[in-house]
Amino acid sequence: MKISLVVPVFNEEEAIPIFYKTVREFEELKSYEVEIVFINDGSKDATESIINALAVSDPLVVPLSFTRNFGKEPALFAGLDHATGDAIIPIDVDLQDPIEVIPHLIEKWQAGADMVLAKRSDRSTDGRLKRKTAEWFYKLHNKISNPKIEENVGDFRLMSRDVVENIKLMPERNLFMKGILSWVGGKTDIVEYVRAERIAGDTKFNGWKLWNLALEGITSFSTFPLRIWTYIGLVVASVAFIYGAWMILDTIIFGNAVRGYPSLLVSILFLGGIQMIGIGVLGEYIGRTYIETKKRPKYIIKRVKK
Protein backbone atom coordinates (compact mmCIF):
# COMPACT_ATOMS: atom_id res chain seq x y z
CA MET A 1 0.00 0.00 0.00
CA LYS A 2 1.37 3.38 -1.02
CA ILE A 3 0.91 6.55 1.03
CA SER A 4 1.86 9.93 -0.45
CA LEU A 5 2.86 12.86 1.76
CA VAL A 6 2.41 16.21 0.00
CA VAL A 7 4.80 18.76 1.52
CA PRO A 8 4.86 22.39 0.27
CA VAL A 9 8.11 24.13 1.22
CA PHE A 10 9.29 27.73 1.00
CA ASN A 11 12.72 28.61 2.39
CA GLU A 12 12.73 25.57 4.68
CA GLU A 13 16.35 24.40 4.39
CA GLU A 14 16.55 23.80 8.15
CA ALA A 15 13.31 21.86 8.52
CA ILE A 16 13.46 19.54 5.48
CA PRO A 17 16.24 17.19 6.71
CA ILE A 18 14.58 16.88 10.13
CA PHE A 19 11.20 16.17 8.55
CA TYR A 20 12.64 13.58 6.16
CA LYS A 21 14.55 11.78 8.92
CA THR A 22 11.49 11.76 11.19
CA VAL A 23 9.29 10.21 8.49
CA ARG A 24 11.82 7.57 7.47
CA GLU A 25 12.61 6.56 11.07
CA PHE A 26 9.00 6.36 12.26
CA GLU A 27 8.40 2.67 12.88
CA GLU A 28 4.65 2.65 12.29
CA LEU A 29 5.11 3.88 8.71
CA LYS A 30 7.74 1.31 7.72
CA SER A 31 5.08 -1.21 6.71
CA TYR A 32 3.86 1.20 4.00
CA GLU A 33 5.48 2.50 0.84
CA VAL A 34 5.69 6.19 1.77
CA GLU A 35 6.19 8.63 -1.09
CA ILE A 36 7.22 12.19 -0.16
CA VAL A 37 6.30 14.88 -2.69
CA PHE A 38 8.19 18.08 -1.89
CA ILE A 39 6.92 21.21 -3.68
CA ASN A 40 9.52 23.98 -3.66
CA ASP A 41 7.48 27.17 -3.94
CA GLY A 42 10.18 29.45 -5.35
CA SER A 43 12.55 29.26 -2.37
CA LYS A 44 15.61 31.54 -2.25
CA ASP A 45 17.69 29.38 0.10
CA ALA A 46 19.09 25.84 -0.33
CA THR A 47 15.65 24.19 -0.30
CA GLU A 48 15.81 23.11 -3.96
CA SER A 49 19.24 21.51 -3.74
CA ILE A 50 18.29 19.69 -0.53
CA ILE A 51 15.14 18.07 -1.95
CA ASN A 52 16.98 17.19 -5.17
CA ALA A 53 19.74 15.52 -3.16
CA LEU A 54 17.16 13.52 -1.19
CA ALA A 55 15.58 12.38 -4.46
CA VAL A 56 18.93 11.07 -5.71
CA SER A 57 19.32 8.79 -2.69
CA ASP A 58 15.63 7.94 -2.22
CA PRO A 59 13.46 7.00 -5.24
CA LEU A 60 10.32 7.66 -3.18
CA VAL A 61 11.14 11.37 -2.90
CA VAL A 62 9.56 13.48 -5.66
CA PRO A 63 11.02 17.01 -5.91
CA LEU A 64 8.94 19.67 -7.68
CA SER A 65 10.30 23.19 -8.08
CA PHE A 66 8.20 26.15 -9.21
CA THR A 67 9.65 28.85 -11.45
CA ARG A 68 8.64 31.41 -8.82
CA ASN A 69 6.61 31.73 -5.65
CA PHE A 70 3.02 30.82 -6.59
CA GLY A 71 1.73 30.38 -3.04
CA LYS A 72 0.83 27.49 -0.77
CA GLU A 73 -2.54 26.71 -2.35
CA PRO A 74 -1.09 26.12 -5.87
CA ALA A 75 1.75 24.16 -4.24
CA LEU A 76 -0.77 21.85 -2.57
CA PHE A 77 -2.59 21.39 -5.87
CA ALA A 78 0.68 20.55 -7.63
CA GLY A 79 1.40 17.95 -4.97
CA LEU A 80 -2.00 16.34 -5.51
CA ASP A 81 -1.39 16.36 -9.28
CA HIS A 82 1.89 14.46 -8.91
CA ALA A 83 1.23 12.18 -5.92
CA THR A 84 0.78 8.53 -6.89
CA GLY A 85 -0.29 6.98 -3.58
CA ASP A 86 -3.48 5.11 -2.74
CA ALA A 87 -3.99 7.72 -0.02
CA ILE A 88 -2.63 11.26 -0.02
CA ILE A 89 -1.80 13.35 3.05
CA PRO A 90 -0.90 17.07 2.82
CA ILE A 91 1.35 17.97 5.73
CA ASP A 92 3.55 20.91 6.77
CA VAL A 93 7.31 20.39 6.86
CA ASP A 94 7.62 22.09 10.27
CA LEU A 95 6.13 19.02 12.02
CA GLN A 96 3.55 21.07 13.90
CA ASP A 97 1.29 18.37 12.51
CA PRO A 98 2.90 15.32 14.18
CA ILE A 99 3.88 12.27 12.13
CA GLU A 100 2.42 10.16 14.96
CA VAL A 101 -1.09 11.15 13.82
CA ILE A 102 -0.68 9.58 10.36
CA PRO A 103 -1.29 5.92 11.42
CA HIS A 104 -4.59 7.01 13.00
CA LEU A 105 -5.61 8.71 9.74
CA ILE A 106 -4.74 5.55 7.80
CA GLU A 107 -6.73 3.41 10.23
CA LYS A 108 -9.88 5.51 9.71
CA TRP A 109 -9.37 5.40 5.93
CA GLN A 110 -8.99 1.62 5.95
CA ALA A 111 -12.23 1.47 7.95
CA GLY A 112 -14.06 3.07 5.01
CA ALA A 113 -13.64 6.85 5.20
CA ASP A 114 -12.95 8.73 1.96
CA MET A 115 -11.46 11.67 3.85
CA VAL A 116 -10.06 11.77 7.37
CA LEU A 117 -9.68 15.23 8.91
CA ALA A 118 -6.98 15.97 11.47
CA LYS A 119 -8.63 18.36 13.92
CA ARG A 120 -6.59 20.49 16.33
CA SER A 121 -7.97 19.96 19.83
CA ASP A 122 -5.42 22.37 21.28
CA ARG A 123 -4.04 25.44 19.46
CA SER A 124 -2.03 26.86 22.33
CA THR A 125 1.09 26.91 20.14
CA ASP A 126 -0.61 29.60 18.03
CA GLY A 127 -0.79 33.18 19.26
CA ARG A 128 -3.98 34.45 20.89
CA LEU A 129 -4.71 36.83 18.00
CA LYS A 130 -4.31 34.08 15.42
CA ARG A 131 -6.58 31.73 17.37
CA LYS A 132 -9.26 34.40 17.75
CA THR A 133 -9.20 35.54 14.12
CA ALA A 134 -9.31 31.91 12.97
CA GLU A 135 -12.35 31.34 15.18
CA TRP A 136 -14.10 34.40 13.71
CA PHE A 137 -13.28 33.30 10.18
CA TYR A 138 -14.66 29.78 10.63
CA LYS A 139 -17.89 31.14 12.13
CA LEU A 140 -18.35 33.73 9.37
CA HIS A 141 -17.48 31.33 6.57
CA ASN A 142 -19.80 28.59 7.80
CA LYS A 143 -22.66 31.05 8.27
CA ILE A 144 -22.57 32.48 4.74
CA SER A 145 -20.85 29.81 2.62
CA ASN A 146 -21.57 26.36 1.29
CA PRO A 147 -20.12 23.84 1.94
CA LYS A 148 -19.18 24.40 5.54
CA ILE A 149 -15.63 23.68 6.67
CA GLU A 150 -14.77 21.92 9.91
CA GLU A 151 -13.41 24.31 12.54
CA ASN A 152 -9.76 23.97 13.57
CA VAL A 153 -8.93 21.76 10.61
CA GLY A 154 -6.12 22.84 8.31
CA ASP A 155 -4.75 21.14 5.22
CA PHE A 156 -3.50 18.17 7.28
CA ARG A 157 -5.82 15.29 6.41
CA LEU A 158 -5.94 12.01 4.51
CA MET A 159 -7.70 11.74 1.16
CA SER A 160 -8.45 8.62 -0.82
CA ARG A 161 -7.29 8.33 -4.43
CA ASP A 162 -10.90 8.83 -5.64
CA VAL A 163 -11.21 12.11 -3.70
CA VAL A 164 -7.93 13.40 -5.14
CA GLU A 165 -8.94 12.51 -8.69
CA ASN A 166 -12.16 14.50 -8.22
CA ILE A 167 -10.21 17.49 -6.88
CA LYS A 168 -7.89 17.39 -9.90
CA LEU A 169 -10.91 17.89 -12.18
CA MET A 170 -11.55 21.36 -10.76
CA PRO A 171 -10.40 24.05 -13.20
CA GLU A 172 -10.37 27.17 -10.99
CA ARG A 173 -7.21 29.24 -10.58
CA ASN A 174 -8.29 31.08 -7.41
CA LEU A 175 -7.73 28.31 -4.91
CA PHE A 176 -9.03 27.93 -1.38
CA MET A 177 -8.05 24.35 -0.69
CA LYS A 178 -9.94 23.93 2.59
CA GLY A 179 -13.16 24.79 0.77
CA ILE A 180 -12.33 22.65 -2.26
CA LEU A 181 -11.50 19.65 -0.08
CA SER A 182 -14.85 20.02 1.71
CA TRP A 183 -16.76 20.57 -1.54
CA VAL A 184 -15.88 17.15 -3.02
CA GLY A 185 -17.76 15.40 -0.22
CA GLY A 186 -17.51 11.68 0.52
CA LYS A 187 -17.59 9.81 3.81
CA THR A 188 -15.65 11.88 6.33
CA ASP A 189 -14.15 10.98 9.69
CA ILE A 190 -12.13 12.99 12.22
CA VAL A 191 -8.99 12.37 14.26
CA GLU A 192 -8.18 14.91 16.98
CA TYR A 193 -4.62 15.84 17.91
CA VAL A 194 -2.58 18.46 19.76
CA ARG A 195 -0.52 20.73 17.54
CA ALA A 196 3.19 20.77 18.34
CA GLU A 197 5.78 23.55 18.27
CA ARG A 198 7.57 24.30 15.02
CA ILE A 199 10.83 22.29 14.72
CA ALA A 200 12.84 24.93 12.83
CA GLY A 201 12.57 28.25 11.02
CA ASP A 202 9.72 30.73 11.10
CA THR A 203 6.22 30.70 9.67
CA LYS A 204 5.97 32.20 6.19
CA PHE A 205 2.38 33.35 6.74
CA ASN A 206 1.73 36.88 7.94
CA GLY A 207 -1.45 38.81 8.72
CA TRP A 208 -1.81 40.13 5.17
CA LYS A 209 -1.50 36.67 3.59
CA LEU A 210 -4.02 35.25 6.05
CA TRP A 211 -6.41 38.13 5.28
CA ASN A 212 -6.16 37.45 1.54
CA LEU A 213 -6.68 33.73 2.14
CA ALA A 214 -9.82 34.51 4.16
CA LEU A 215 -11.13 36.73 1.33
CA GLU A 216 -10.39 33.95 -1.13
CA GLY A 217 -12.31 31.49 1.01
CA ILE A 218 -15.41 33.65 1.25
CA THR A 219 -15.52 34.89 -2.36
CA SER A 220 -14.85 31.38 -3.72
CA PHE A 221 -17.78 29.76 -1.94
CA SER A 222 -20.33 32.49 -1.22
CA THR A 223 -22.20 35.24 -3.05
CA PHE A 224 -23.53 36.64 0.23
CA PRO A 225 -21.18 39.68 0.18
CA LEU A 226 -22.75 40.64 -3.15
CA ARG A 227 -26.31 39.92 -2.10
CA ILE A 228 -26.11 41.87 1.15
CA TRP A 229 -25.64 45.14 -0.74
CA THR A 230 -29.15 44.79 -2.15
CA TYR A 231 -30.49 44.85 1.40
CA ILE A 232 -28.17 47.66 2.48
CA GLY A 233 -29.36 49.67 -0.53
CA LEU A 234 -33.00 49.06 0.40
CA VAL A 235 -32.39 50.15 4.00
CA VAL A 236 -30.50 53.31 2.98
CA ALA A 237 -33.13 54.17 0.35
CA SER A 238 -35.92 53.65 2.91
CA VAL A 239 -34.18 55.87 5.47
CA ALA A 240 -33.62 58.55 2.81
CA PHE A 241 -37.29 58.37 1.73
CA ILE A 242 -38.57 58.64 5.31
CA TYR A 243 -36.20 61.52 6.08
CA GLY A 244 -37.23 63.32 2.87
CA ALA A 245 -40.93 62.88 3.65
CA TRP A 246 -40.38 64.16 7.19
CA MET A 247 -38.60 67.30 5.92
CA ILE A 248 -41.44 68.04 3.49
CA LEU A 249 -44.09 67.63 6.19
CA ASP A 250 -42.03 69.64 8.67
CA THR A 251 -41.77 72.50 6.19
CA ILE A 252 -45.45 72.41 5.13
CA ILE A 253 -46.99 71.98 8.57
CA PHE A 254 -44.62 73.88 10.83
CA GLY A 255 -43.00 76.18 8.33
CA ASN A 256 -39.50 75.25 9.47
CA ALA A 257 -36.76 76.01 7.00
CA VAL A 258 -34.98 73.06 5.48
CA ARG A 259 -31.74 72.53 7.37
CA GLY A 260 -28.67 73.48 5.37
CA TYR A 261 -25.39 72.18 4.22
CA PRO A 262 -24.04 70.19 7.21
CA SER A 263 -26.78 67.55 7.00
CA LEU A 264 -26.53 67.52 3.20
CA LEU A 265 -22.76 67.08 3.32
CA VAL A 266 -22.96 64.27 5.87
CA SER A 267 -25.60 62.49 3.77
CA ILE A 268 -23.50 62.75 0.61
CA LEU A 269 -20.37 61.48 2.34
CA PHE A 270 -22.29 58.63 3.97
CA LEU A 271 -23.89 57.50 0.71
CA GLY A 272 -20.57 57.91 -1.12
CA GLY A 273 -18.85 55.70 1.44
CA ILE A 274 -21.56 53.05 1.17
CA GLN A 275 -21.25 53.07 -2.62
CA MET A 276 -17.46 52.78 -2.53
CA ILE A 277 -17.62 49.80 -0.18
CA GLY A 278 -20.18 48.13 -2.45
CA ILE A 279 -18.03 48.81 -5.51
CA GLY A 280 -15.04 47.33 -3.67
CA VAL A 281 -16.92 44.10 -2.91
CA LEU A 282 -18.10 43.91 -6.52
CA GLY A 283 -14.53 44.53 -7.66
CA GLU A 284 -13.28 41.56 -5.63
CA TYR A 285 -15.62 39.23 -7.51
CA ILE A 286 -15.00 40.82 -10.92
CA GLY A 287 -11.23 40.66 -10.40
CA ARG A 288 -11.37 36.98 -9.54
CA THR A 289 -13.64 36.29 -12.52
CA TYR A 290 -11.18 38.17 -14.75
CA ILE A 291 -8.31 35.99 -13.53
CA GLU A 292 -10.34 32.83 -14.13
CA THR A 293 -11.18 33.81 -17.72
CA LYS A 294 -7.48 34.05 -18.62
CA LYS A 295 -7.12 30.32 -17.93
CA ARG A 296 -3.49 30.62 -16.94
CA PRO A 297 -1.95 27.51 -15.34
CA LYS A 298 -2.17 27.27 -11.57
CA TYR A 299 1.60 26.83 -11.38
CA ILE A 300 4.66 26.26 -13.57
CA ILE A 301 7.16 23.56 -12.65
CA LYS A 302 10.79 24.33 -13.35
CA ARG A 303 12.12 20.89 -12.70
CA VAL A 304 10.89 17.38 -11.98
CA LYS A 305 13.64 14.97 -10.97
CA LYS A 306 13.60 11.47 -9.62
UniProtKB/Swiss-Prot annotation:
Residue intervals annotated with topology Periplasmic: 249-262
Primary residence: membrane
UniProt entry tagged with the keyword rRNA-binding: no
Signal peptide extent: none
The organism's place on the tree of life at top rank: Bacteria
InterPro entries: Glyco_trans_2-like, Glycosyltransferase_2, Nucleotide-diphossugar_trans
Similarity comment text for this entry: Belongs to the glycosyltransferase 2 family. GtrB subfamily.
Function in brief: Involved in O antigen modification. Catalyzes the transfer of the glucose residue from UDP-glucose to a lipid carrier.
Protein's UniProt name: Prophage bactoprenol glucosyl transferase homolog
Taxonomic lineage from the root: Bacteria, Pseudomonadati, Pseudomonadota, Gammaproteobacteria, Enterobacterales
